[in-house]
Swiss-Prot record:
Keyword Ligase appears in the UniProt entry: yes
Catalytically driven reaction(s): IMP + L-aspartate + GTP = N(6)-(1,2-dicarboxyethyl)-AMP + GDP + phosphate + 2 H(+)
Extra facts: Parasitic protozoa lack the de novo purine biosynthesis pathway and rely exclusively on the salvage pathway for their purine nucleotide requirements.
UniProt name for this protein: Adenylosuccinate synthetase
Biochemical pathway: Purine metabolism; AMP biosynthesis via de novo pathway; AMP from IMP: step 1/2
SUPFAM superfamilies in alphabetical order: P-loop containing nucleoside triphosphate hydrolases
GO molecular function ontology, one term from the record: magnesium ion binding
Amino acid sequence: MPVRRYGGRYNNSSPGVSNALSPSTTAGRPLSPSPAAGSKLASTHHDPVPQEAYYVNDEADAWHQQQAPFREPSVEVEVEMIDDEPPHGSQKSLSVAPYTANASSSSGRSKRNAITASGYTFYTNERQKTVYEALRSLRPLAELQEPRRVKEYAETSLKDSLYRIIEAHDVIMVAGAFFGDEGKGKTVDAVAHHPLCTCIARVNSGENAGHTVYDKAGRKFVFNLAPSGLLLPGKRNYIGPECVMDPVSFMEKEIIQLIDAGIDYRDRLFIGNVCIVTPYHKLLDLLGSAANSSTLKGMAPVHGSKVMKRGIRLDHIFNDDETLRKRLEKDMDTYLGLLKVKNLSDADVVRLCREENSDGVVRVPDYVIAFAQAKDKVEFLVKLYRDRVRHNPDFPARCDVTYELHAAVLRGEKVLLEGPQSYWLSNARTKFWESTTSADTTAAGLLAASQLNFQKFKSVVLNVHKAPGSSRVGIGACPSSFVPQDYFSAQNIKTLRDLPSETCANFEAVQRTLFRDGFPHSNDKARHNGIMAPVEYSDETGKYNIGVAMAIASAQHHGECGAVTKKPRVCGFFDCVLQHEVNSIQGPYLTISALDRGDEYDKVGVTIAYVYYNPEGKQVDVNGHVYKNGDIIRAGDPVPSEPALYHCHPIVKLIDGWRDNPIAAAKRRRNAPLPRGVCELLSTIEYFTNCKILSIGNGPNGDDIIYLRQ
């Protein structure tokens, strides 16, 4: 496994960085060497598994006969949140099951050593300290003193802020500005409540995106593809033809919630001719994806079928079975071919599926496993779609979504495009291309997928980010993260339950250690250069590198994990380098969610630049520019791609917190002046990104938003 480290600069080389570093070292973060012997690290799902004796159904009907006609009697309605509203303020620490270790030493040390066998470490080693000694000589950037003037932000009303923007445009897009999970739902809800906003649409991506919404009665609904406006009376909701849908999962996990709640959706939800995610797409995802690299929702395989024009769309299910059979048979060649190449039997696939579900989290549904067992797989699918979709009286109405959205705008109505994932997770962004989703989830991708006339209709983008605790889930580079993106998965930590009990559970102590010891010259402007020192945090369970401690503590304290899977997201500092490009491409408006978290921080960190440092001294050529050790990448410079970003370290500006003047909705007096720390944070973000901050989130409720006067 390659060393994945962070930091960089586009043009100016800093003379203050030493090159005298041993290979495979990194400042302030755990190393990522090749897995040690006996490692738990499962690099991919590719390896063939031994043959085992499994009972495989000879008839496809055997499974179907056991099922209810249109829904299973027991349906899990809560799914993993890929883009959930981030929790706010103080969160009760998640219950974490103890980690069982074989070592006989003290409980904390034995637990830690059992996990570090993967090659990563919880503690700081000597090589990390050596690297920090080189980077600490970096001359402080003048930008660390910016902005020279802190703006004063005045609160205004929803009507004088957001509603004015809505009324000046025809198409409103709410888009993620980082790597998903930014808390877009609250902004979507605010826009959807505008009386002129009659249409809410999801126009691309699939069930790998998600959001939680609540109705007036406080009932919780977890949606993936279903638009948020379904709970608002008088709103029409659409799922466009560029979306990809597993219709069985859609009915069992999303529509069933509406049925059980007695919500009539028949005249308010319409589905276009979507591409169909089949069970073999999900199995291809399982068999071909590295650990932690996929949601196992079949996204890459189904988009491959779409591009190759081999898959099926919803209309195929509602027409003759013979055409459906032929298309399924042709498209399934990829799946059957992979089994042959990997020398896998159906029983092997079933075993892998059950292993994925062995911790109690259903990542592979029963009907997908039943497909893997079926002898006649094509006939299994034809019957599945006939019973669960075509003949299902609960399946929503279908329509030409593009036509309906166009007609609505011509009538003077407003259309809200609900963006899945985010700008940097878009497959159209080459910088993170290998670790993105498979759709273009930028604002440009949303508008293109909607097929609304961009020359005729006025559109606006509301970008959403969160702070503190910006996060990314899955693999890939993320310079401002506290640990590498594969840190948890490399140690076989699929959920927060896999962490030792009470590990870094005292968030207050962890963050205090970070800002007190991790930035030793934070109060000395002449010496503070923004490089985080590899100090350690200790508790009763052991000793931890401060980056590791913050990653664990943030995930637990802020609830940064999947709602059901508990898969931890990797948190870090707000990244102005990446945010600058987002606002330069998608427009100036930015809303920051969950800012009330800052009520519990001594200081808040903001990444204003990267320093490139490859411990092996290697240079990286990106778009014709060669990055070398000591180069600085500032906000506004071209963002390099992942081969360079893996060796980029954040340069962090620290801002004093506002503990004595909390902004959480439950504690703040309405229209009270914002604390200086909040104003300095917002001023810093605006200065380095050229954005206009429209609002900040300050609580869990839908109306816990502070709108700022422009």
